[in-house]
Structures are given as structure tokens and as C-alpha cells.
Amino acid sequence: SITNEQILDAIADMSVMQVVELIEAMEEKFGVSAAAAV
């Protein structure tokens, strides 16, 4: 299985737009919103 460090390394290599798309994809997959709590 993949480690948190491997996930962070992969995200670090992505552009801002790719990260935004990743977050949207995760929201769809898990049926959640990644909006930060204030």
C-alpha cells in the first residue's frame, strides 16, 4: 500500500490545477466536501 509520504511527494509534483482537479475527484468519489472548517 502507499504511504502518506508517497502521496505527499506525488501532490508536490503536481500543478495547482492538477491539485484542484484531484480534490474535486476525491469529493466526488467519497461524497464529501473538502472545504476547510473555519
From Swiss-Prot:
GO cellular component: ribonucleoprotein complex; ribosome
GO-annotated molecular function: structural constituent of ribosome
KW RNA-binding (keyword) present: no
Keywords: Ribonucleoprotein, Ribosomal protein
Gene Ontology biological process terms, A to Z: translation
Cited InterPro entries: Ribosomal_bL12_oligo, Ribosomal_bL12_oligo_N_sf
A family per Pfam: Ribosomal_L12_N
Family recorded in the similarity comment: Belongs to the bacterial ribosomal protein bL12 family.
Subunit structure: Homodimer. Part of the ribosomal stalk of the 50S ribosomal subunit. Forms a multimeric L10(L12)X complex, where L10 forms an elongated spine to which 2 to 4 L12 dimers bind in a sequential fashion. Binds GTP-bound translation factors.
Function comment: Forms part of the ribosomal stalk which helps the ribosome interact with GTP-bound translation factors. Is thus essential for accurate translation.
Name under which the protein is recorded: Large ribosomal subunit protein bL12
Organism the protein comes from: Salinivibrio costicola
